[in-house]
From Swiss-Prot:
Subcellular locations according to the entry: Nucleus
Name by which UniProt lists this protein: WRKY transcription factor 68
Feature: compositional bias, Acidic residues: 69-79
UniProt source species: Arabidopsis thaliana (Mouse-ear cress)
Source domain of life: Eukaryota
InterPro entries: TF_WRKY_IIc, WRKY_dom, WRKY_dom_sf, WRKY_plant
A Gene Ontology cellular-component term: nucleus
């Protein structure tokens, strides 16, 4: 056993040391012939009929690449959602602009000591705001009718404190309320009775006294505004005049303002006089 491998070639030495059991499978004549390099490595040349599937273990690089791909998909989904939300926001904004109608505004400048002028409609004050570079605040009013959205802004002019600037926003959707005739004792020279008869707004006593002192004609503030408002309301002026006249007569008769003077009431019954009147 000590002389084993002495004088043997390198391929035989490697064969006997590394694979001692190969002699059982090969002939003795194999020692005489050179052995190939693949035989030295112990790799058999025959190929199996069925090759098993190769399952490679997951490496850190493959897992990281999958994570990166997942992040990219999430980012794309987030960008798509943001794009959709932006489109929806733009669409709603454009629809709001289209549905929002322009409200007409009309402004009047009137010389008056009274800030809130009587224009024939009923208003409710809902706010007050200071005006830049002006010591006079701005007052905000709203029409008291439930289905009417007309607003009014009243402020005194900074350049001319004796003038009042009234701005109307919108158009009334209802007729003006009927005006009540003044009581007995009021002088017709001030023009209040004639203004109420033709449908113009009655001004407060303070403003009437101020107008009489200044000897000015009645302002066109009420007439111009009312004419613009009544253009959008369809009604018959003659019928309205008759109704106002009959209601005014009933009010005067009920208050006892119309009295019979002289002896005519002793001869003719009172109901005949009322019918002829």
């Amino acid at each position: 056993m000590e002389n084993v491998g002495v004088g043997m070639p390198f391929y035989d030495l490697g064969q006997t040391r590394v694979y001692p059991l190969l002699s059982d499978f090969h002939d003795l004549s194999a020692e005489r012939y050179p052995v190939g390099f693949m035989d030295l490595l112990g790799v058999h040349r025959h190929t199996p009929t069925h090759t098993p599937l190769m399952h490679f273990p997951t490496t850190p690089n493959s897992s990281s690449s999958e994570a990166v791909n997942g992040d990219d998909e999430e980012e794309e989904d987030g960008e798509e959602q943001q794009h959709k939300t932006k489109k929806r926001f733009k669409f709603t904004k454009m629809s709001r602009k289209q549905t929002k109608k322009k409200v007409p505004k009309v402004s009047f400048i009137t010389r008056s000591e009274v800030l809130h002028l009587d224009d024939g409609y009923k208003w409710r004050k809902y706010g007050q705001k200071p005006v830049k570079d002006s010591p006079f605040p701005r007052n905000y009013y709203r029409c008291t009718t439930t289905w009417c959205d007309v607003k009014k802004r009243v402020e005194r002019s900074f350049s001319d404190p004796s003038s009042v600037i009234t701005t109307y926003e919108g158009q009334h959707t209802h007729p003006r309320p009927l005006l009540i005739m003044p009581k007995e004792g009021s002088s017709p020279s001030n023009g209040s009775a004639s203004r109420a008869h033709i449908g113009l707004p009655t001004l407060p006593p303070q403003l009437l006294d101020y107008n009489n002192q200044q000897q000015q004609a009645p302002s066109s503030f009420g007439t111009e505004y009312i004419n613009r408002q009544e253009k959008g309301i369809n009604h018959d002026d003659d019928d309205d005049h008759v109704v106002k006249k009959s209601r005014t007569r009933d009010l005067l008769d009920g208050a006892g303002l119309v009295k019979d003077h002289g002896l005519l009431q002793d001869v003719v019954p009172s109901h005949i006089i009322k019918e002829e009147y």
